[in-house]
Amino acid sequence: MHLNAWQELRVVGVEDGGFFREPSGSAAQKALFVCVLLHGNWIEDFQVDEITVDGLDASKKLVSMLHHWAFHAVMLAGVSFAGFNLVDPTLVFEEFGKPVVIVSRTKPDNVAVKNALLRHFEDWQIRWGIFERLGPIHEVSIINEVPLYVEVVGEDIEWTNELIRASAACCRIPEPIRVARLIARGLTRKAR
């Protein structure tokens, strides 16, 4: 993807803020959930909401937030937010018909994920189904950087590689995710 093409795209980055684990029996804990709309490298808009730690409301919240924008693609910083509150990339793609790119800094270990889901969640099959619907994990290398690991729904890996490389403006992390992370972590620190 030529840099000029990247400058014309509107891409959403999604990231969560941190949280502290509360003792068992405490009220449902929340974490910030941030979506940023970038037009090229320019921040066009952002939204902040809350999702439940280890809940199942992240997909619904994301779909609701995305209905406010016109965009070309969504980049998720993984599929797990606020612990194991999972965004279903297939559901997001089906709702909007736009590619959903899942970006991970480290290679996902789906065996460990499945084991954790089995141990901690009665509804593990629902959560695991989200992982099963994802495509293969691909490695994307940025010059002089450690590789990223990506999965994509709704587009091919060649397009995805070009999008990742074009949107990695100042480091290996694509700018939509990097900006969403800065906002989410900054607001989380401010709230504590």
Q: Where in this protein do the model-derived segments appear?
A:
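Charge-biased, low-complexity intrinsically disordered regions
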Residues: 1, 48-50, 59-63, 114-115, ...
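Conserved active-site and cofactor/substrate-binding residues in soluble primary-metabolism enzymes
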Residues: 6, 30, 53, 57-61, ...
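Long, charge-dense
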Residues: 89-147
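Ordered, amphipathic secondary-structure segments that act as subunit-interaction surfaces
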Residues: 67-100, 104
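Charge-patterned, long linear interaction tracts outside catalytic cores
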Residues: 152-192
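A glycine-rich, hydrophobic loop/mini-helix early in the fold
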Residues: 27-82
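Two-metal-ion RNase H-like nuclease active-site motif
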Residues: 1-26
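Gly/Ser/Thr-rich loops at beta-strand to alpha-helix junctions
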Residues: 17-20, 78-87, 106-109, 155-158
